């Protein structure tokens, strides 16, 4: 019921105008699943031998799907089904199967479409064959934590080969072999750091302990139950 208009001026700047006061009417709104949350079980399946996972109702807006495109560039076996439009947004179910991943160089212009997914992408890269190079990720230093520094330190602690650069990480993967693990990772109260290392622990010889998982409730309150179910616990 709102009187709302969106216009783009000659310089390409969008102007959103809202005229109030309006009489708002209740509506049923179906919200697509978050691609950021979907990335965690998908990467867990990709790095764990014998695994296959289907995540349903994932939002596939092109501005948010960089993580899936880069995983596919690494050789990820991802299948899309039940593609449809929900609330004006493209949605699909994604099936991920264990895959032999290969390192890639991620173009900096892809970063905006997967900026929140880089922590779990780094985990995938640490298990891949060969070198993965990322750059243009300065924004990761000013998220809920310095995600470049924390991911580099954490991955090194569990046995990965990582070079931290000012605007990205260079990761030489394990070739699909499990990492050593067996250490406790500081999440720095960052939900994505905590979830990323929880997933990494699924493919480590001695597992991984995350010091504080409470921040996970910020974005994915059922994450621990989901990961336990996927692990057969």
Residue ranges and their predicted role:
Residues 1-233:
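Short, structured segments at the rim of ligand-binding sites
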